[in-house]
Regions:
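Charge-dense, helix-prone N-terminal extensions
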Residues: 1-122
Length: 122
């Protein structure tokens, strides 16, 4: 069961974060990026998929905040089904965690990773 307007609620928050852009996702839905890095994507009003480093993904799954990815369970990706109003808030929190991790490695001047940011400072 999908939550009415869940994707719009998520989008209205995520696009307020500095540097975040939205694109059509290749498998449907909306993909959010910081530079070239995908922060996650939303499939309609029912599912959010978010990439994390494997260690972080294991913590998130162990805490019951999300499930292993619905198609690629042995990767760093997690899936969160939007079934209850609190799931939208949890999706935003997890997308924010992905954003915070990506932001540490991103330079708006370079639009790329930490090495580029370091080189720009030299």
């Amino acid at each position: 069961m999908a939550l009415k307007d869940a994707s719009m609620q998520i989008q209205s928050i995520v696009l307020e974060w500095p540097g975040v852009t939205a694109y059509p996702h290749r498998f449907g839905g909306v993909e959010y990026r910081l530079g070239a890095r995908e922060l996650g994507h939303v499939h309609g009003d029912y599912l959010v998929d978010i990439p994390f480093p494997t260690r972080v993904r294991e913590e998130i799954v162990a805490a019951g905040l999300a499930e292993p990815h619905h198609i690629l369970p042995d990767t760093g990706w997690v899936s969160l089904y939007l079934r209850a109003p609190g799931d939208v808030e949890r999706a935003v929190e997890l997308l924010r965690r992905s954003f915070d991790l990506a932001r540490r490695k991103w330079s708006p001047a370079q639009g790329q990773g930490a090495k580029d940011a370091e080189n720009a400072m030299e």
